[in-house]
């Protein structure tokens, strides 16, 4: 056991912030320092190369004792767990030849002024560590106990009389009917259940997994109901089955897309190729991960995103996740530095993360998983809502909604799973088993706070997106084999772990299975059979393949370094047998490298009947499949509607318009969402056509997201979110209709072809066990399932429910309860024929125009439940939330609106579009003004007493910009669609930096543009200051609030229409480029495409191909090192990848030889840039290059930034000097750190960030990583090798940029970079 001391764990500003938090409780406490400490376990019988280990970890062996009066505390991963960092770093060190069994990293904190008071203070402990994921240890000796392995628990048998006790002990959440069912079945079997069987049954039959409430029969108000909830949802598909290829049958729904050609490597040769144009299809799925996010926000949200991504990948026989969405509903934020009068104090549940902590950590978790996996997150929503119903009852989201969804691509031949046959091999693909997420399916199905804290911890999960990336590469390879795809069927591993996934896999094919527990990969030898079978370790899939394909499948996994194990076989008898004593066919034998834990094999194909009773008695599981899936009791719910709500009504005549406008814009639901958007990569994959950010000033105001179906088409997919949950406190049916309506009005920003092509995912949340809430849920489902969606010809082929949305705890001698409203989040998806015809809220500057409001309420202007009401709910009395509830009164109105928008778009009448939602027309208009850096004169033609309802009602509708010259054509079209009474002019843009409310030429209220912007930006600014570098937050606010800021201002020094590579392409010669990737790299496809378009022949090269000698760099004229997260960037971005080269002599020599050849070139982008910078010692002319370290903001930065091409020797940038170009930026470690000032002066800089005036960008976020003089790209003395942090390969077409000048053609000027390389080769 070795303990090493590493570098400082906290930057100066984080250290100061940390100390300040501690001193609020113990003022005399000071932090002397905080350092990484590494705990390393050596493999038995081996010795470490300590000098290499010090070099790789940048650590030292000496761990000096603390100074006098200084106390050290160690914050380590929670005892008994393995951190994601450990898994990734262990693999990295194995690749570098280090014989370690395990490594963990913690933080040593040295404290001055520690006292007995501090040692026993819960507030201090809370600041030092998170008990859900960490342990606080007092000495190095205690630290060394981290790797202690306890004895595994034995298999338990549970007497039937003790089932109730077991139900409570393990938090199984079984109903009384289910316990009776189990007693009956086990009595029939003449035996008692094992603990493994009970846990498996509980997870497989939890509300989370089996949706018992949605499948229940109902009696409401003593009246039998005709339909179950699920039947009403399915009714929409029965009414409108068109364009849906798979519904309710798989991990995700599949809908028709436009024809497209896939671009991917040939699975045999690795050569990139354009495949034939085939009918398109894409899968859609939206999940929630509410309970884990409430307990541990970062890992909860991260694994929520990861689980949904796996659902897309595991659809049919293999899909490819393409783009994501996310969302959060929480209670009041209560930001300490931004108090709001409506955020009144109350007791909070001590067992759950606060709303503030959830929104500081949860979005980072969701974004981190998407970023590292390599999926752009293009859409989201955020709601903060809380109402006090009494002193002990709150309607809010203490148990949050954490939404994770998205869409993916799937080949039509792979939509339907194949049936497993007896003898087919059961595969576990992905990471090892650990004691993670045990019982999560059941835990998420009960009221938060009613289980024990130990069970809360047991359901906490951990993430490793880099592992999931490897799994996806295996899936992609299998899918690319087309009809030879070895995957017959598979499922992702989620709630319930293998105990749910493997039985589901077998049950789908009506087969049984024999599983050897010894074959399940595990990183924890102490796991009991229950823990091994039921844990929810993430990034795993279960697959069924033919035994004949096993060796070929193993080869794919080996190349991708993706762990897998053949754990069992399917059997004709529908019996599930799981244990350590089973025998499996010799055909399942694969090499030691793939299956480290092998049992003895025989040629006998196992069946339950051939196994002797004495052996079967020892099995953890020996059950007929129908015990799990057959005849469990069906729920019946007998309920009644609660009394009608009596929330006081807001008297808007008593409000001050000026202050009301500022309050509404400052509400977190309305306010700017930049702090949630820029942390997520939105350009990875190269298929983004509309992300959140719009315009030259890059504000996240897009109404929908759009992706492209392929690299050579403008057809694609659009998706949008609708959510109006607080209205359910007034009328749950109306809230559901409004959610659907809002999803449609958001989606209308895209060129939607037909309402019947729109498919919805419905995510339902409710506190179903609170009296009457289930009846309100029934009303909501009926409102859209039976009534609205069929009337619109829209179907709901996929969805999810989470029906334990309440928490309960004791405080001040009373029981407190927090219950969410009945909440529906609608995600709408549709194919689009031409993504270029999208509209955004960006107003056109050069056109005389007016803004028109199409208000679908027909003038009712209902204010019930509005943000205006919420921000004035600060009196001691009951909150003024009531009044008439907004609603979609007639589906025909929404149909007419949809048709109007399509016809107006087709006629070229619309310049801009923005839907009306939270904050009403006032907020929507302000957002359009903010996005466009324009002022507005807002007109109110009705009586002044109706001013507040006119401006702040949140009925369905949209605002469009129409040029004056098209006014008549637009109003004629409005009349044709019968919407004249719903349409009015509401504003016109001005160049003045002000927003005015005008009535009969009288100014009723006026704000400066910056005053309103400051209110709108306040939440983002406050959250960034708490979460990121506060200096960066201040700098961004100052730039964003400047009305005269120039924004993105591109200029070109060359004609991009001139293709310098064309003469060489015409020769028919295509030089070969290695598209190089390491495990965790995710940007290789778009990189290959850009080189291919420039005239190169591209080949997919994994580092394993070079290590094994399958290929050699001599075979390639060029090398492109791609972006991503090699080894999860655990030791610094790109360092793991570089280490895998530097620590292998033969590989190091091969790269050195390639770099030395003057007829070879190399390009490193992002992670490839970081990796090549670490190899500068072997690259001629690169000796002055910097290292790339953490961004100054200490946050992942995803931006569209403005670059200037500097005159340099770079062959890639020849003829481009002086150009100023927008480009996608997405990295966490892009700060260029030079060894000396002389190196910075001598380095050949090729690219730098600039501001809109053409000057080197020194302020954030124009310089997103803080590099000196904006440096972000460098080259060698001869220019053959260039490295850059931004991503030109993601934006070869103007459709890929979030904004570009109107005069640019189909391609962006960045294609010149790749064409220059082809011209250089000649």
From Swiss-Prot:
Keywords: ATP-binding, Cytoplasm, Glutamine amidotransferase, Ligase, Magnesium, Metal-binding, Nucleotide-binding, Purine biosynthesis. GO terms for biological process: 'de novo' IMP biosynthetic process. It is an enzyme of class 6 (ligase). Its main location: cytoplasm. It is found in: Cytoplasm. Gene3D superfamilies: 3.40.50.880, Phosphoribosylformylglycinamidine synthase, linker domain, PurM-like C-terminal domain, PurM-like, N-terminal domain. GO terms for cellular component: cytoplasm. Its EC number is 6.3.5.3. This is Phosphoribosylformylglycinamidine synthase. It comes from Xylella fastidiosa (strain 9a5c). The lineage of its organism: Bacteria, Pseudomonadati, Pseudomonadota, Gammaproteobacteria, Lysobacterales. The gene is purL.
